[in-house]
Amino acid sequence: MQGYDIPRDVISLLKDAETYLAECLQNEKLSGRAREQRDEILHSFGQIRNRYGVEFALKGGEAAFTHTGQDDYDDIHNASYAPSQASDEVSVASDYVENDSEVEEELDKIFKQGYLERRKKDHGFFGSEWQKRWCVLTTRAFLYYSSEKGKQPKNGFLIKDSLAQMMPYIRKDSRRDSCFEVVTPNQQVFQFTAASPSDARDWVEQIQFLVKDTQSTIIPYEDDEETYDDIESTESSPVVGLTNDSENSLQEDDVYESIPGDEETEESEDENYEMKPGEPVIFYGDYYQGLWNCFSDNSDELSFERGDLIHILSKEYHAYGWWVGELDGIVGIVPKDYLTLAFDL
């Protein structure tokens, strides 16, 4: 089918008319005849979109309507027509998830979720500039739904290498301090308003943390054959197994100290062994060595150089790629992928 070149102002007028009928008149008290005419016109919009599909385009080849049924007006629950897709969004189907199973798998990694108001660029004359959306932040992406009960994300974007920051100037009302924006690597801008300034700051901090976490998993390339051999030798290190051994050792020591008679048995087996009161117990499985130089940009991170011996105090943030370590009396978080076990046990 030959494509149709539709002027941009005509497309804008059509979108405004459809939005006015669908949104502005949805909750108005209309007569039975008026509501019937409204539904007939909306149905005609859907028929035109289905008939011309992606070939119903603007001059220059920019698609004005698609048959996907997802757009800035995707929260209008009217089955008689299919809305258009706005040009300011990244399609989840094309850029992030490819099937329902991938969506379900990603939702198992939810980091933060809640209602936000998303700013629309092409909201038209009658449409609202801000849309309320149920937003979900996972370890890899930012997804948003038409409501909390939505099963399929309407749109979203990958957070890798994105920039999140507070942006108070985008609103002039009392909620200006609750605004923030996210800029993706391809310079797409997504602007949101949270319920409160503290909630907005929390969204920004969580996104920044996840972006930093994705960057920390990238192993820098070094043109050094010796370094390559060192990395090769550490790939098979049983880190998880040694962690379990360390925890088991702690439990065994607790039992050893609490059960009477074990000390006598131990002394009978080894007469030369004498345990001094207050002697600290060293778990060599908690000591790691730096694989590369790591210079921190934040006060909560620990800087170290290759070969430094770091005492790991906690692996609480293991799922995010960070541990809590100590070096020369200084405590901070360290990227776990930059470390290798210091002792062979």
From Swiss-Prot:
The domain of life for this entry's organism is Eukaryota
Compartments, record wording: Cytoplasm; Nucleus; Cell membrane
GO process annotations (BP): adaptive immune response
What InterPro entries has UniProt attached to this entry? PH-like_dom_sf (IPR011993), PH_domain (IPR001849), SH3-like_dom_sf (IPR036028), SH3_domain (IPR001452), SKAP_fam (IPR037781)
Q: Which segments show compositional bias classed as Acidic residues?
A: 250-272
| GO CC terms in record | cytoplasm; nucleus; plasma membrane
Query: What residue stretches are annotated with the PH domain?
Result: 109-212
Keyword vocabulary terms for this entry? Adaptive immunity, Cell membrane, Cytoplasm, Immunity, Membrane, Nucleus, Phosphoprotein, SH3 domain
Post-translational events: Phosphorylated on tyrosines.
Asked whether the keyword Protein biosynthesis is assigned, the reply is no
SH3 domain span: 283-344
Q: Where is this region: Disordered?
A: 226-274
Q: Its quaternary structure?
A: Homodimer.
Physiological role: Positively regulates T-cell receptor signaling. Required for optimal conjugation between T-cells and antigen-presenting cells.
Q: Which PANTHER family match?
A: SRC KINASE-ASSOCIATED PHOSPHOPROTEIN 1, SRC-ASSOCIATED ADAPTOR PROTEIN
Recorded family membership: Belongs to the SKAP family.
Name this polypeptide is given: Src kinase-associated phosphoprotein 1
